[in-house]
Amino acid sequence: MLIGVAEDSVRRPTLAEAKVEMDLLVQAGFNAVRVTQIWAPGETKLSAADQRILRNVVQAARLDGVQVLLTVMNFGNRTTPLTEQRREEFAAYAAALASALPQVRYFVIGNEPNINRYWLPQFSPDGTDAAAPAYEALLARAYDALNAVSSKIVVLGGAISPHGGDDPDSIRPTHSPTAFLTDLGAAYRASSRTKPIMDGLALHPYEDNSSVAPIDGVHPNSTTIALADYDKLVTLLGTVFGGTAQRGSTLPIYYDEFGVEAQIPPAKASLYTGREPVTVKPVPEAVQGAYYRQAVELAFCQPNVRGLFLFHAIDERDLNRWQSGLFYIDRSAKSDLRLVRAAISQAHRGVVTHCPGLALLPRGSLVVAVRPVPQATLLCDIDCTYVVTVRRGSRVADRSRGRAVGGQAKRIRLGLLRSGLHYMVTASLSAPVNPGHATVLRAVPFAVP
């Protein structure tokens, strides 16, 4: 699972500057970053300046082993791509991005098309949904354009806000994710399309405010979809896309924005401007860290989820914006950085929490060296408990048990083996927290000199 951050601070004019910002993300434990690229009407290709900036991002990410997700979006509701010409331009622009940046595999199409800030109109004059059918047409066109560049590209649709009013007469017309996905599915069926429109769903599962714990943010009786509403989301996807060429209940899910705002301590207050909206309800840093850990645990246990992206790594300066980062605006670390980094590490190692029904199978490698003394080097992709057995023919010559940390080589002494004899070494591996069947590794047979 990707555990990353939505953070445009890595968009820098030089590689050196981009690398400094990317290093900060790695310090927090993230293995992915989502950045945005704005499309404007009439554009069909990248400017030289934007291409240089994005190549710096991609190069810095490669140096740090970070995966890049690229959101292609219009800026605000005045540039919504509503006509066939605008959709063609948008799709050509996305394809140009993919051609210029072949290292980028993941593309998110649009941003929160279910709310009026990013997409208008939301409703037709008769009160029916105008946004979902128009977005479906854009997503289909972008999907085809990106796949024409490379079939390996993963197109993520939606990037949906978790809330919405579903009231065409509201002064702020919006759609709930439930209504928007329902209407998106209806538009897809009406198109008679025989190909998918997305390879995964992007969703922004924010809670009602920052004081709500992710594990408590369940909405069985409303149209909101937050982190703990996974079962509701999967059921909805199965309903709206079932029986079509578009995957529904098995569609991969990417939570590409989730944030909890933290209170700014007095010692850092002078770094910030503006006033915090009363509706935000920021929490102490320790609570922010605990909530981010809950978010990681929830996503880790949800079978279709492939990614969780926090919003942001670094605070925004304006208190009317987002102070949801793990670093203050001056790039110094918040007190909960270590807690969140540990949760991310444990998720990558498969031990962040126990999940009912989850059965992990460690994968790894086993190499034996005979000098200076016989020893095996075991490397597991996730944490593993191991039983290493040395055999000479059918006889067990040595056996050792232990636990290895995922991604870290474990050296295991093989006991006193006799010179001139041939041996075979095997390792039986199991996941310590969410065990499935054992994985058995076999090293190349060897002789002790």
Language-model segments: residues:
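Solvent-exposed serine/threonine-rich low-complexity stretches and specific carbohydrate-binding patches
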Residues: 396-407, 444
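Surface-exposed, short loops/turns at beta-strand junctions within beta-sandwich domains
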Residues: 414-421
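Noncatalytic carbohydrate-binding groove/subsite architecture in carbohydrate-active enzymes
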Residues: 71, 86-91, 129-278, 282
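Short beta-strand elements
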Residues: 436-449
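Short strand-edge motifs at loop-to-beta-strand transitions and within beta-strands
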Residues: 408-412
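Boundary/entry segment of secreted carbohydrate-active catalytic domains
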Residues: 1-36
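Aromatic-rich peripheral "rim/lid" segments of glycoside hydrolase catalytic domains that contact
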Residues: 16, 45, 113, 117-118, ...
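Substrate-binding cleft and catalytic face of glycoside hydrolase catalytic domains
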Residues: 24-170, 208, 316
